[in-house]
Amino acid sequence: MGARASVLSGGKLDAWEKIRLKPGGKKRYRLKHLVWASRELERFALNPSLLETTEGCKKIIGQLQSSLQTGSEELKSLYNAVVVLYYVHQRIDVRDTKEALDKLQEEQDKSQQKEQQKAADKEVSQNYPIVQNIQGQMVHQALSPRTLNAWVKVIEEKAFSPEVIPMFSALSEGATPQDLNTMLNTVGGHQAAMQMLKDTINEEAAEWDRLHPVHAGPIPPGQMREPRGSDIAGTTSTLQEQITWMTGNPPVPVGEIYKRWIILGLNKIVRMYSPVSILDIKQGPKEPFRDYVDRFFKTLRAEQATQEVKNWMTETLLVQNSNPDCKTILKALGPGATLEEMMTACQGVGGPGHKARILAEAMSKATSTAIMMQKSNFKGQKRIVKCFNCGKEGHIARNCRAPRKKGCWKCGKEGHQMKDCTERQANFFRENLAFQQGEARKFSSEQTRANSPASRELRVRRGDNPLPEAGAERRGTGSSLSFPQITLWQRPLVAIRVGGQLREALLDTGADDTVLEDINLPGKWKPKMIGGIGGFIKVRQYDQIPIEICGQKAIGTVLVGPTPVNIIGRNLLTQLGCTLNFPISPIETVPVKLKPGMDGPRVKQWPLTEEKIKALTEICTEMEKEGKISKIGPENPYNTPVFAIKKKDSTKWRKLVDFRELNKRTQDFWEVQLGIPHPAGLKKKKSVTVLDVGDAYFSVPLDKEFRKYTAFTIPSINNETPGIRYQYNVLPQGWKGSPAIFQCSMTKILEPFRAKNPEIVIYQYMDDLYVGSDLEIGQHRTKIEELREHLLKWGFTTPDKKHQKEPPFLWMGYELHPDKWTVQPIQLPEKSSWTVNDIQKLVGKLNWASQIYPGIRIKHLCRLLRGAKALTDVVPLTAEAELELAENREIIKEPVHGVYYDPSKDLIAEIQKQGHDQWTYQIYQEPYKNLKTGKYAKRKSAHTNDVKQLTEVVQKIATESIVIWGKIPKFRLPIQKETWEIWWTEYWQATWIPEWEFVNTPPLVKLWYQLETEPIAGAETFYVDGAANRETKLGKAGYVTDRGRQKVVPLTETTNQKTELQAIHLALQDSGSEVNIVTDSQYALGIIQAQPDKSESELVNQIIEQLIQKEKVYLSWVPAHKGIGGNEQVDKLVSSGIRKVLFLDGIDKAQEEHEKYHNNWRAMASDFNLPPVVAKEIVANCDKCQLKGEAMHGQVDCSPGIWQLDCTHLEGKIILVAVHVASGYIEAEVIPAETGQETAYFILKLAGRWPVKIIHTDNGSNFTSTVVKAACWWAGIQQEFGVPYNPQSQGVVESMNKELKKIIGQIRDQAEHLKTAVQMAVFIHNFKRKGGIGGYSAGERIIDIIATDIQTKELQKQITKIQNFRVYFRDSRDPVWKGPAKLLWKGEGAVVIQDNNEIKVVPRRKAKIIRDYGKQMAGDDCVAGRQDED
């Protein structure tokens, strides 16, 4: 025995003897337990010496654990002792057996997780596109449709928010460039974003080529060539090459490199789409910390910063920008806290948890005598124990010193002890805490829903009386009793009368007995013990007590004792006929808000006719009975107009509410379903049923807080009484939130049914349900009934009228048969005259039919609808439209069917060219069995060619296929590989086509001509040009050749652009089979270089015909008016008599410059030495310059370092304008978004060019942002803000905005993009307009002012030079500039001047100092009196 006792050495034995057998018990482990354990081990055939080590104990635990479930009490005790010993060996402190067992459980769970993790790591992820086959070769498996579909969904749902980048990164794990291109192509519809991405890829590819020059000489045999930039982008490399690079030794990870480039581009796109700075992310006062952290990291991912900077942001900004409550907690945690610790510490601060805690505290006060801790969740808290024997707190009956009470401690009866007592416990305190009204709850699963407190009511009724209508009122007395209705938003407390005494009690359907506190009742009582939440309480039982509850009387047993709250249990509630009722669908409401800063609609009700008022009154009375709408009082200030229309083919009326105003003010919703399901994507099913949900919207409750905004009024005839006011309790028809909320609720409701029946396919679109399965029809129908039951439980009816059990099924406008589908029969109307509305409907029907009838065309029918016509206008059919309609009628006569999708077979798409820019296509798996067909007739640009259109068709089909089937079909295209290659090499960045093969179905797609890339030796060179006069619309076009030929033709009703094209046409007509053409028109060059083969312009079509006939054509561009030989000659030829010539030398140059820059008369007079009258005549003759100049008044600070900034809007874009106040010089730029980031960047650029001391802006959010403040601080710029709502404080920049817009208007047609026009206008304003002080242009003036400022700063040193400066100044209240005066002295804040022998001191901000160059001022000695005359 001694040997066995030596299991533990001295120190460990002490620890062993401190451990308690039970939590809170007195007994502890002793030496005897070790001796007993070693003996027991021998009984179980285990070696007792195992007890001496940690490892040994672990082995014993492993052996015993498996037998625990079936083992005896001794075995369990042995196991417990060994577990405690295991921890003593490891010198880990445990206080009692339970803690040791808990620790072991935790340890085992952790090791199990690690095992699972290891196992998971061993399995290869399916997303790695390059895998090794059995032969050991590296092969490529294409990205799965699921991956592509996930990517498309990400872009559709998130647009380009920051999450897109990690999602892209995860989905493209290990992908090859070809896979990455597939991913990009599936979202090719986002053209602006893709263009940005393309630019980034091209830049990166060029940079790669620069850093990795090609090695000279041939590549040694067996060695791979090195990838170029375009190889990495997957455009000039094959899939095999990509795999070889990626798996070679050493590898070139082309996939990863390309992915990095794409992520760079995505970063740019994200910055454009969600320009939020991390500095702007602050936690709201009531925002849960977890939500704030999510927003913070979402923005952090989009920030352009190194990882170190991001780490710093996380450490400092996260805490700094949290709200005060969380900040206090986080600071207490100290700087080293992990994110997990922060989240745990701040859990529930400010969120709904606050309310829960307050409720819990209130509850604990009410039930402080009756708390029982659950298991050991609250370690360390002492529970209050109460003695059953004497009733005192602080000890239990076993340790009670008072004499033992006779009988049972539970029921008080003699003859048995408590452990043998059979008396039932009274579950008296089973009150569910309902959340406060309007608090968002988690959507519980349907099992828990059955007893959730969401929207139930307690009704009290007697006997089997039918329930009267909700809300009915008591009328009269006696038997016409109406029963109260009690909602469960608050605890159902009611006033009761017991034996004549008034009390308040809780109606508790979960308690068996009725228990009251502190009430004296007559008659005999029996002692009784009942079990409550906090243990047992002693009560007195009174029988046959009359109780009155809510006017209903009952007689029953009442228990009286120390209950924390008076309870009416089921023994009385059942007598009263009290029921739990679920009214309108128990679906939880979706919280809805108005747009920030907006209030509800207040639109007056318009007058209605008597019959409409009657109809509406009837409809609303019915709806009110059904609980769909409720009457409201005058306290609701909102209103939406309501009217009535007759239902189609019936005498019944229908109520319509005009929710347009409310829709404008309601928050935006995410469109839950992006399109409608298509039958071609359905898999073939044995049994099918189609259901329709009745009164769909009216089954879903509307958010309680939002209901007030749906108020409407039914007026009375002749206003004899005030209108009746109602508001909606359910989703209204016509409100913009209804579809999204309905679909969201429907999806949640179907979720448990779908999970329970995975073999059943349910397609849900709004209220149409398609249910398919491979079950036998009997079983299938049973499932359908289960589904209908399930929907009914949630308040959705599925009317038998619209329940389709037998094929053909009519669903979503389609007709479904067991093995094929078609569109529902289409009738094309026969009419002698067609209105716009008729043709719109006809085109709609044909469009719908085109998904299954191949060859339908509608181009000429659509042409009839061009221009703004009224719906009722009669439109004559053109001959082409008649023919098109007749062809379509023939096609539709023969019914055509589509088949269903078979996932085991490949998809094939075949495309045909129909001519006239129309294309048709079929998608099938077996020949002649089409899944679906379609047509394409979009023209994305005015001048296009077939190859470009073909790629557009392919991309449309690819996107459509991913949506319907989740994968891309193989394409069969009517184009030869060579033709495609030729075109594609030029345009690879813009397009990508998936796997395809050539199919010879005429007409084939071909490139009709090709332009040479180098001049053609020996061919004649034609210099072409054209000119037109804007007013007379007369023009000339012509050419001059290097062989001395020339030709000019006069044109009428033309424009500059047309004459340029006409000149090219002339050159092509008059030249041989090979020709070089030189033009100075970017416009003409741009059109022809894209190799169009058709155009909306007749002239371009004629040029195309000429180009097709030539063998070789080279087209090149030179800048105009730069004295280039042939170009200058032809320019003179076509200009004579067209561009206006006045009667003086130098005028033509001035006029030409004016046509380009619209400079003012002063600039022309000075630059071309023209008399003012002639210069003014040029301006007067320009139709774009006949706008009045605007005078500037008001007193503005004119110090040299001050700039005013403002944003203005034009063509839907934002222009940021900066004006140098003293000179009127402008800097302006089109910015992508009105954000602090863009503004700060602009300010830094400005500060890098000019000395900026002060910027003066309005209070726009971009100017007041922290980013701008930081930029100003860094550049040492002082920021001043204007007076809110007083545009005058921004006067200079405001008037410059107008001026700039005026100039842009004059030259807008010279530039394609607004950003170009803005820079042209800035140039014109700064250098081509003269006037104002000194007769300078703004550009000359700013340089003069800055130079002068530098010189005058040296004034004190060189006081003698001061006489050379002149000062223009303003007096205090007079806005007119005076001067010039002599400068005597310049200080920091003021200048001293001499004006007509009078010496004055003028504040620095009211003076402009200019060097006197002895130049003649425009005007006499005072310029300022004249405003600019431009």
Swiss-Prot record:
Residue span(s) of domain Peptidase A2: 503-572
Site positions per UniProt: Cleavage: 128-129, 359-360, 372-373, 427-428, 435-436, 483-484, 582-583, 1022-1023, 1142-1143
Gene Ontology CC annotations of this record: host cell; host cell nucleus; host cell plasma membrane; host multivesicular body; membrane; viral nucleocapsid; virion membrane
Residues annotated as the enzyme's active site: D508 (for protease activity)
Chemical reaction(s) catalysed: Specific for a P1 residue that is hydrophobic, and P1' variable, but often Pro; Endohydrolysis of RNA in RNA/DNA hybrids. Three different cleavage modes: 1. sequence-specific internal cleavage of RNA. Human immunodeficiency virus type 1 and Moloney murine leukemia virus enzymes prefer to cleave the RNA strand one nucleotide away from the RNA-DNA junction. 2. RNA 5'-end directed cleavage 13-19 nucleotides from the RNA end. 3. DNA 3'-end directed cleavage 15-20 nucleotides away from the primer terminus; 3'-end directed exonucleolytic cleavage of viral RNA-DNA hybrid; DNA(n) + a 2'-deoxyribonucleoside 5'-triphosphate = DNA(n+1) + diphosphate
GO biological process: DNA integration; DNA recombination; establishment of integrated proviral latency; proteolysis; symbiont entry into host cell; symbiont-mediated activation of host apoptosis; symbiont-mediated suppression of host gene expression; viral genome integration into host DNA
Region (Dimerization/Multimerization of capsid protein p24): 273-359
InterPro entries for the chain: Aspartic_peptidase_AS, DNA/RNA_pol_sf, Gag_p24_C, Integrase-like_N, Integrase_C_dom_sf_retrovir, Integrase_C_retrovir, Integrase_cat-core, Integrase_Zn-bd_dom_N
Residues annotated as domain RNase H type-1: 1016-1139
Annotated spans, Interaction with host AP3D1: 12-19
Polar residues bias locations: 445-454
Domain Reverse transcriptase: 626-816
Record motif Nuclear export signal, residues: 16-22
Keyword Repeat: yes
Region Interaction with Gp41: start-end pairs: 7-31
Misc. comment: HIV-1 lineages are divided in three main groups, M (for Major), O (for Outlier), and N (for New, or Non-M, Non-O). The vast majority of strains found worldwide belong to the group M. Group O seems to be endemic to and largely confined to Cameroon and neighboring countries in West Central Africa, where these viruses represent a small minority of HIV-1 strains. The group N is represented by a limited number of isolates from Cameroonian persons. The group M is further subdivided in 9 clades or subtypes (A to D, F to H, J and K).
Name of this chain's protein: Gag-Pol polyprotein
Organism: Human immunodeficiency virus type 1 group M subtype F2 (isolate MP255) (HIV-1)
Designated gene of the protein: gag-pol
